[in-house]
């Protein structure tokens, strides 16, 4: 018998197939491997301002490459998974490239190929059309039914709606451009008063649309000097229009440059052009405001396409670097501007070609010990870069010419160094001696490098730094009664936007909660808030649709440059530490010729500083008053009636703040104990902490008692406070006999007068 032939196993076949696949894979992998010299290396660009590069000059990098360890050949490389091999290879020079041969080279005429193509093409087209016709027929039927149904509905609606304005409604979508042009022309105002300044028609059109009929004194004085190419130091009171005084000449230069480019027929790329102006401000809010005002001026100017880059903290650095690439005007705070310039490539070189350097609120930016970054920026702009040789000499000469063409514009309401001296303390006080214009010039010439030896110093109001329509007052009270008098002042001025200034962030947080507990629409603004929260507070406070009685409790962050319409009342909860701070705080009201009030709530220990403040600010007054601040006397009946409300609100606020602080401290101590591997006992820690005697022991004890208030006690206090707030403050009127003659019943029914009081209360006029 013959032996059966054994059948091969499936596993052996699979292994053979796998071997074949592996071999082919290895072969493909060997073809994909390249050496170091074949890779397309890219040079790493270093930042402009790098103190220590650590020897990494000429560093090169490459992405998307896997390293393969070989034998005798050493390291080899291949493209990462999903990337083609061509992406990592060095591009060959044109002479090294091999000639390409086209497979579809023409080799004469062929009748067969043509006929085949002619035959196959229509057949394929017919098949496609037949397949496409089947669904389209059904779709057409459905479309017809839908159209008929819509037509029936339209006829029914047309019969039901027989309104006379039907024709007008049908015209709305197709308004002509002529109608829009007529509306734009009607919106403008007469700007003939601006023509004497020699402005372009585009700027005059923008001013007309923005409804600026006449220029202010600082604008009349500064704009012609800046247009003539002079360096200018402008001093004017708050709210006098300093932003347009330097914004208009900058846009004039931009429009003139744009006209020259159009005449020459060249269109420069936005990314390659250097900015024409750098504007620096001390606060983020002021920078946003400058960008808004100059942006509106550029938006309404026909033919203007100026791009404004806003560089402030709290926002993405990478995004701001991208925006800076094609910007015409750069506005920002010194810290973020220096961070963006020093971390980028070629930005400092590009920024050194600016035509205008504007320093707003210069006394704050250039004061000693503040804004070190501002000095770095000024030094980088004026520094001649070293290391350029040979053919780059012409470039250096051009850049030196660009620096020589740069105009420096400096603006503020207070240039006097004497105003920056602290008012309180036992240090030697220099009295009311205010620096002359010559001394102010010397002070600024030491800080800045002007193009001209003697820049134009324009002082619009040499007698006083305060606005003309501002009324100043002072309320004297005890140190522990400031909350009471603040609430009373706010009741005296309902339906008016009020700005309350404090000297600390903790006071802002406490006062905001206190006023909110008293039923007042209070918002907070301080430097520790996130940038979005800061912008949100300013928008809510300044919005025309917001509560007209809105209150913004802020630190000196809001003291400079913030232009919010409708602020009628400024309250200094703490006396300012320096005279220039008082000038800028009070300048948030009585802007652009309007009237306003500024009141200081003064404790006995602050009286010395307030007297010095008045002597400094009003040293050159013609009437010779030593204390021009008018003393205000509040109705004692009102103060006594509202004391219970304020005490309850203060207890609730202090309890909430104490609970938050204790919880935060416990969480921190508990986390620290866990990290150390130690058991944390809060009672033992408190007993050990209470043994010592110190300055803050009484404060800690009050905080502990406030934190021990239970939820039920808090709820009871809230209910009592709510009941008190629901009633008007009675100032000696019998509620049973309202018609006794002391109350105007008709005015009460009409809602006239001050709705906070029941009875006659004299308004706070001074």
Swiss-Prot record:
GO terms for cellular component: nucleolus. The Q motif is unique to and characteristic of the DEAD box family of RNA helicases and controls ATP binding and hydrolysis. A motif (Q motif) lies at residues 192-220. ATP-binding RNA helicase involved in the biogenesis of 60S ribosomal subunits and is required for the normal formation of 25S and 5.8S rRNAs. The gene is mak5. Its main location: nucleus. The keyword Transmembrane does not apply. Residues 485-635 form the Helicase C-terminal domain. This is ATP-dependent RNA helicase mak5. It is found in: Nucleus, Nucleolus. Residues 223-433 form the Helicase ATP-binding domain. A motif (DEAD box) lies at residues 360-363. Residues 78-91 have a biased composition (Basic residues). CDD domains: DEADc_DDX24, SF2_C_DEAD. GO terms for biological process: rRNA processing. One of its GO terms (molecular function) is RNA binding. ATP binds at residues 236-243. Residues 95-106 have a biased composition (Acidic residues).
């Amino acid at each position: 018998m013959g032996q059966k032939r054994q059948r091969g196993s499936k596993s052996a076949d699979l292994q053979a197939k796998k071997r074949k696949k592996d071999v082919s894979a290895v072969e493909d992998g060997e073809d994909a491997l390249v050496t170091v010299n074949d890779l397309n290396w890219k040079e790493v660009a270093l930042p402009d301002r790098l103190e220590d590069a650590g020897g990494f000059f000429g560093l090169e990098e490459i992405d998307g490459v896997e390293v393969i360890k070989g034998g005798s050949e050493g390291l080899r490389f291949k493209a990462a998974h999903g990337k083609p091999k061509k992406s990592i290879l060095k591009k060959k020079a044109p002479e090294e490239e091999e000639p390409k041969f086209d497979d579809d080279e023409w080799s004469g005429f062929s009748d067969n190929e043509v006929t085949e193509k002619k035959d196959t093409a229509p057949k394929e087209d017919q098949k496609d059309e037949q397949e496409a016709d089947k669904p389209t027929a059904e779709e057409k039927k459905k479309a017809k039914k839908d159209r008929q149904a819509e037509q029936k509905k339209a006829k029914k609606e047309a019969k039901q709606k027989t309104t006379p304005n039907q024709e007008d409604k049908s015209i709305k979508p197709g308004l002509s451009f002529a109608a829009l042009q007529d509306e734009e022309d009607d919106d403008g105002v007469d700007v003939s008063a601006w023509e004497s300044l020699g402005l372009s028609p585009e700027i005059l059109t923008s001013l007309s649309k923005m409804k600026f009929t006449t220029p202010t004194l600082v604008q009349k004085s500064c704009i012609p000097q800046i247009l003539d190419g002079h360096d200018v130091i402008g001093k004017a009171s708050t709210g006098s229009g300093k932003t347009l005084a330097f914004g208009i000449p900058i846009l004039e230069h931009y429009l003139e440059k744009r006209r020259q480019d159009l005449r020459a027929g060249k269109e420069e790329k936005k990314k390659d052009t250097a900015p024409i102006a750098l504007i620096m401000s001390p606060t983020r809010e002021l920078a946003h405001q400058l960008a808004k005002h100059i942006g509106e001026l550029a938006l309404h100017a026909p033919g203007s396409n100026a791009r404004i880059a806003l560089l402030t903290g709290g926002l993405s650095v990478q995004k701001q670097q991208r925006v800076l690439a094609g910007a015409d005007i750069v506005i920002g705070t010194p810290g973020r501007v220096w961070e963006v310039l020093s971390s980028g490539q070629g930005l400092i070189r590009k920024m050194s070609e600016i035509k205008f350097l504007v320093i707003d609120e210069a006394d704050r930016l250039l004061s000693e010990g503040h804004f070190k970054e501002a000095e770095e920026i000024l030094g980088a702009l004026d520094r001649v870069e070293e290391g350029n040789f040979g053919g780059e000499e012409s470039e250096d000469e051009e850049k030196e010419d660009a620096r020589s063409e740069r105009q420096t514009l400096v603006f503020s309401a207070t240039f006097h160094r004497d105003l920056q001296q602290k008012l309180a303390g036992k240090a030697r006080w220099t009295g009311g001696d205010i620096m002359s214009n010559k001394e102010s010039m010397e002070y600024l010439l030491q800080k800045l490098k002007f193009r001209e030896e003697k820049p134009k110093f324009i002082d619009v109001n040499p007698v006083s730094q305060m606005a003309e329509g501002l009324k100043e007052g002072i309320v004297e009270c005890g140190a522990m009664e400031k909350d009471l008098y603040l609430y009373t002042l706010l009741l005296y001025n309902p339906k008016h936007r009020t700005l309350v200034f404090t000297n600390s962030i903790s006071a802002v947080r406490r006062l905001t909660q206190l006023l909110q507990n008293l039923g007042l629409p209070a918002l907070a603004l301080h430097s520790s808030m996130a940038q979005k929260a800061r912008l949100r507070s300013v928008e809510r406070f300044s919005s025309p649709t917001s509560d007209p009685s809105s209150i913004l409790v802020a630190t000196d962050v809001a003291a400079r440059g913030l232009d919010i319409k409708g602020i009628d009342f400024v309250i200094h909860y703490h006396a300012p530490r320096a005279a220039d701070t008082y000038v800028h705080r009070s300048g948030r009201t009585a802007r652009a010729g309007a009237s306003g009030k500024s009141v200081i709530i003064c404790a006995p220990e602050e009286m010395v500083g307030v007297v010095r403040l008045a002597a400094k600010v009003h040293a050159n007054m013609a009437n010779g008053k030593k204390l021009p601040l008018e003393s205000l006397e509040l109705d004692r009946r009102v103060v006594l009636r509202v004391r219970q409300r304020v005490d309850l609100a203060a207890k609730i606020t202090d309890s909430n703040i104490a609970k938050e602080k204790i919880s935060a401290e416990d969480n921190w101590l508990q986390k620290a104990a866990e990290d150390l591997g130690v058991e944390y006992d809060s009672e033992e820690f408190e007993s050990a902490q209470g043994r010592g005697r110190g300055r803050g022991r009484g404060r800690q004890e009050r905080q502990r008692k406030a934190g021990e208030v239970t939820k039920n006690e808090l709820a009871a206090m809230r209910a009592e406070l709510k009941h008190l707030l629901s009633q008007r403050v009675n100032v000696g009127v019998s509620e049973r006999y309202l018609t006794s003659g002391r109350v105007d019943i008709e005015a009460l029914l009409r809602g006239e007068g001050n709705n906070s009081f029941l009875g006659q209360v004299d308004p706070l006029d001074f």
